[in-house]
């Protein structure tokens, strides 16, 4: 089974990203600084050149304007405004959820993939295998595992009915 892979970044390190498998999509997520459009264009061009998908977190309008591959809507984003936007066919809207209520909101937001977290022990929102599996059965959307994935537990996710996984530390450690 081929799993989709998503790498959350908050700074751009082209040398590191270039070393990673081409099937790993990039999600730029930086809530601590103002949006740097020129940096986003640089990342977009890098990703296109290297045949890699690029998603922007939490800004549908800008992702559309920059003609990115899609947008990632975090669990705290409950807005439905983007439903009225003119969205091209191959533009993907993906997003995260921690519970059934958030899954229902993501379905209303018309996302294609739901990132359910946290599958493995993290500081908050820890689900574990049993709760994760139960939540993933509550939707027909494609499921992406998120949270606490590392070299020690990566093989365990193959036991789940998921389309892929997303991580930060797992890909950072491949440096």
Question: For the regions a protein language model found, what residue spans apply to each?
Answer:
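Hydrophobic faces of well-ordered beta-strands that scaffold small-molecule active sites
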Residues: 3-9, 24-28, 54-56, 71-73, ...
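N-terminal active-site wall of soluble small-molecule enzyme domains
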Residues: 14, 22-86
